[in-house]
């Protein structure tokens, strides 16, 4: 079982909504979903986004009745200036394996991966490998995968690819995004 998490803010930015979708990776069936919302109590500071988003994600995780093997977060793991993005932050707090899968690069340099699905190249920062730039669909922009907590980069890449069917973003990511959007609308 795998859980994917996503967040969204109210239009005025005062409330944060989080969603966790637990799926069976063998058939992508939804096992459980939870949502949470709370007042935003930390200002926007670049590089410290997890202090704004992680509390709501933890609230959603704590509502789960199932116990997923791994949590994937829409955001960075160690591919972060402080090597502690939201996926790492949440992993430390829940003491579970976490993976960061982001739509955009926060830091680092890379050579563009090949155009075929599954192609990937290292994401580097100051000589350190901090993640992989992974093509999840042929001829489509890549995603940025990094270790969050208690997992290997190879496992993170495999999990993200396994969950990617017909779109750029892995299917559980799309489900979590839809769920948090519904929670935001009330």
Which positions does each model-derived feature cover?
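Short acidic, Gly/Ser-rich segments with clustered Asp/Glu that frequently serve as metal-coordination loops
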Residues: 7-13
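Short, glycine/charged-enriched secondary-structure capping and boundary segments
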Residues: 18-19, 85-88, 113-114
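Short hydrophobic alpha-helical runs that function as membrane-insertion/retention elements
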Residues: 97-102
């Amino acid at each position: 079982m795998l859980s994917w998490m996503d967040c969204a803010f109210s239009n005025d930015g005062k409330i944060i909504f989080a969603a966790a979708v637990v799926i069976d990776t063998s058939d992508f069936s939804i096992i459980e979903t939870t949502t949470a919302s709370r007042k935003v109590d930390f200002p926007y500071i670049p590089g410290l986004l997890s202090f704004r988003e992680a509390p709501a994600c933890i609230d959603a995780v704590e509502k789960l009745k199932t116990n997923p093997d791994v949590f994937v977060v829409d955001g960075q793991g160690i591919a972060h200036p402080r090597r502690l993005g939201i996926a790492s932050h949440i992993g430390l707090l829940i003491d579970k394996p976490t993976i960061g899968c982001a739509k955009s690069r926060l830091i680092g340099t890379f050579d563009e991966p090949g155009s075929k699905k599954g192609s990937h190249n290292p994401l580097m920062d100051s000589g350190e490998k901090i993640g992989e730039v992974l093509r999840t669909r042929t001829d489509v922009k890549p995603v940025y995968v990094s270790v969050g907590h208690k997992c290997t980069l190879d496992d993170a890449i495999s999990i993200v690819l396994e969950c990617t069917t017909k779109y750029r973003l892995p299917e559980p990511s799309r489900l979590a995004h839809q769920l948090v959007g519904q929670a935001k609308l009330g």
